[in-house]
Amino acid sequence: MRIAVMGAGGVGGFFGAKLAQGGHDVAFVARGTHLAAMRERGLTVKSALGDIHLPKPAVTNDPAKLGPVDVVLFAVKLWDTESAAEAVRPLVAKGGVIIPFQNGVESIQRIGAVAGAEHVMGGVAYIAATIGEPGVIVHTGTMARLRFGPVLSLQQPIAEALLAACKGAGIEAELTADIRRALWEKFVFLSAFSGLTSVARQPIGVIRADPDLRTTLEAAMREASAVGRAQGVGLADDFVAQQMKFGDSLPAVMRSSMQNDLAAGNRLEAPWLCGAVARMASEAGVPAPVNATLYAVLKPYCAGAVR
C-alpha cells in the first residue's frame, strides 16, 4: 500500500515505521528538528517489541509533494486537525482515505467537514510512545495495537487491505464494525487519565495508589461514560470497572501525552478531552463536575506555557 503518515510523532512514527519495515511505501510528514534529524540520521524506534531503524525514510514537511495515497495515517495533535486535514485533502482525492489515530471522539466529523465524509474512516491507537529526541521514537511498555473501521460501506475494501498490511507488518490490528463505540471506549479512560495526570503532575502509578486520586479518576470516567450513553453509545454496565482494571495493568511510570505537553510548555488537547466531556455533558443535561474542574484548572495552559 501507499501510505502517508501525517504527524510522525509517537503514534505515527511507530506504526509508520512498522509498515515501512514490512515493505510498504510509507512517506512521513514531519517538521522542525524532528524532520531535520530524520533526513540526516533516519528514523529510529526504541521498543521492547523490537527496535527499528529506517536509514533513509521518505520524509517531507509538505504533503503536497507526496501525490495520491491509499491511506493517510493521521496522527497530529488535536489543535492542528483542520489545518492538517486541508493539507492532506488532495492526497485522498482519487479514492484514498484518512484515518485519524488521535485522541478524542470528534475527529471523524472535523476531518470530514474538510476532506469529505467519504474520505474519512475511524481509528483508535493503543500505545504509549513519544519523540524521545529528534528522529527517535520511544515506545513505553508493550501495548501497541490499532483498531479501525469504515464509516461508510464503500470504505470496506480499503479497510480490509490496511488490516492485511498491518498484520503482514507484525502490527496487532483489528477491524471493527462499530468504530464509534471503539472511540468512546478509549475516550472514557483517556480523557480522565490525561486530565488527572496533568493536573496532579504525576504518572498513573501515583494516581491509582492514592485513594483520593483513584476515586477522582473513577468519577471522571463515570461522567464520560454517562455522556457516551446519552449519545447512544452502547458501553457495558461494568465498563468503568473494566477500565480501572486496565489502569492497574499499565506501567506505573506511564504519563499521558498531555502531561508531557504541559511539562514542555506546549499547547494542550484538554478542550477536546476533559473539556469535551464537560461540554457534551452540558449539552446532554448530564452532570460532569469532575471533568469541568479538570478542564477549568488546565484552561490557562491550553495555548501553551503561561508567561
Please provide the spans of the model-predicted regions:
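NAD(P)+-binding Rossmann beta1-loop-alpha1 motif at the extreme N-terminus of oxidoreductases
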Residues: 1-54
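Short, well-ordered alpha-helices that flank and scaffold nucleotide-derived cofactor binding pockets
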Residues: 17, 21, 86-90, 113, ...
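Short phosphate-binding/catalytic loops that engage adenosine nucleotides
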Residues: 24, 43, 96, 171, ...
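Generic preference for hydrophobic
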Residues: 28, 58-60, 148
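Internal alpha-helical scaffold of NAD(P)-dependent oxidoreductase catalytic cores
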Residues: 37, 90-91, 113-119, 123, ...
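Rossmann-like NAD(P)(H) cofactor-binding subdomain of soluble oxidoreductases
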Residues: 52-136
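NAD(P)-dependent Rossmann-like dehydrogenase/reductase catalytic/cofactor-binding core
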Residues: 218-307
